[in-house]
A protein has these predicted regions:
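Alpha-helical DNA-contacting segments of helix-turn-helix folds
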Residues: 47, 54-61
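Basic, helix-initiating cap at the start of DNA-binding domains
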Residues: 1-35, 52
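Hydrophobic alpha-helical connector segments
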Residues: 56, 66-93, 104-108, 112-116
Length: 183
């Protein structure tokens, strides 16, 4: 790929991430092209359609979440799961439009599976350390992330909740529910 083509592609992906994070599925490819300061033809040379661009953006988003899990794995076992879920919450809140449920089918399955595997290991480490209840399952971690996503979406769309960061309180409730009596 030519250098200018690579630069344009990177600009498009960065712009798409910002536009989709802000506007969610309502964003158009025209919005992305404008934000990237390129013409529509340049966008379509790089990405055949909106789904292709969304897949690329979601791949980057999931790679960052995997990086979060890798960092959390370096934390002590009693803190790793908390670090992971808190940082995922921050990422989801910062890029709320990227977590739109309608884009779930476009999420890159190998990256989703790696994220699940890593979050499961964080849970198992916390359970072995005695800080997470033994009956908490990997599905509970997934449900916690879905719940955060829902609260964050509500904060975006409901003026009564806008800007209150209720997701943080909700996460604290979830984390308390995950903790063992000893933790």
């Amino acid at each position: 790929m030519r250098r200018d083509a690579a630069i344009n592609r990177e600009r498009l992906v960065r712009a798409a991430e910002e536009v989709f994070a802000e506007q969610g599925p309502a964003a158009t490819l025209g919005d992305v092209a404008n934000a990237a300061a390129v013409g529509p033809a340049t966008l379509y040379r790089r990405f055949a359609n909106k789904d292709a661009l969304v897949r690329e953006v979601l791949s980057g988003f999931f790679r960052r979440l995997i990086d979060v899990a890798v960092i959390a794995e370096q934390s002590p076992p009693e803190a790793g799961l908390d670090v992971f879920l808190r940082t995922v919450g921050v990422e989801l809140a910062a890029k709320a439009g990227l977590s739109a449920p309608v884009w779930g089918e476009l999420a890159p399955e190998p990256l989703v599976e790696e994220l699940r595997r890593r979050s499961t290991e964080l849970l198992r480490r916390a359970q072995r350390a005695g800080v997470a209840r033994a009956d908490v399952t990997p599905d509970d971690i997934t449900a916690a992330v879905w719940a955060l996503r829902g609260v964050i979406q509500s904060e975006r769309t409901d003026p009564a909740h806008h800007g209150h960061e209720l997701w943080r309180r909700h996460l604290e409730t979830i984390l308390r529910g995950f903790r063992s009596a000893a933790g």
